[in-house]
């Protein structure tokens, strides 16, 4: 049926075209929280997407987590709106192992405008990572999905902002990855139109990963891609 988490067929058939909110998410969370849990929020849907500014779901969710903290809470986003909740996040980091994974996809803002036209500029995202870090929040600059970039410069910027090891993943589209998390098919069209097809090729992606790993090592850090990398968020 492919109907997951209370969603209806139209919700996933038109993925990315609108937002469906679970308005009672914080209430449901309060019922299910336990001290031994590792919670990842959220590998598929950004909790700080633009509509969150109006809906204000995350302050209620963070309030529930502060009242009954899990063992680990990992928060995945690319939205500068996270800074709105800096106070609750700082409180939560005193109670649990809070990790923020903040997506930095390229060092080239013209590429960001091609693939992520509605997302914040790269410079602003790097500044968010610095702000979270300076607030004492364990923050990873996550190179995912890896868009066309200068790998060495991207690694330098990410490590400079976060002061931590890096995690990430190549750009996957359903045409070359039959299972698991992928970027919308529009990315395939953008890549073809802009001459970036090689960035979808697994062999070329492996070459880029090696360059990222090498630069991270040169700067005294490490890089891990895919499940082994994201597993760092739950340790």
Language model regions located:
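Auxiliary Fe-S-binding modules of radical SAM enzymes
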Residues: 147, 151-235
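Glycine-enriched alpha-helix->loop->beta-strand junction motifs that scaffold or abut catalytic
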Residues: 94-98, 138, 160-165
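Aromatic/hydrophobic pocket-lining residues that form the small-molecule binding cavity
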Residues: 58, 82, 125, 151, ...
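Hydrophobic faces of well-ordered beta-strands that scaffold small-molecule active sites
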Residues: 39, 73-75, 100-102, 139-143, ...
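Conserved strand-turn element in the central/C-terminal portion of the radical SAM core barrel
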Residues: 118, 128-151
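Active-site beta-loop-alpha junctions enriched in small/polar residues
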Residues: 44-46, 78-80, 103-107, 144-146, ...
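Conserved Radical SAM active-site core
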Residues: 1-99, 107-110, 122
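A structural motif corresponding to the C-terminal end of an alpha-helix
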Residues: 64-71, 127-139, 206-226
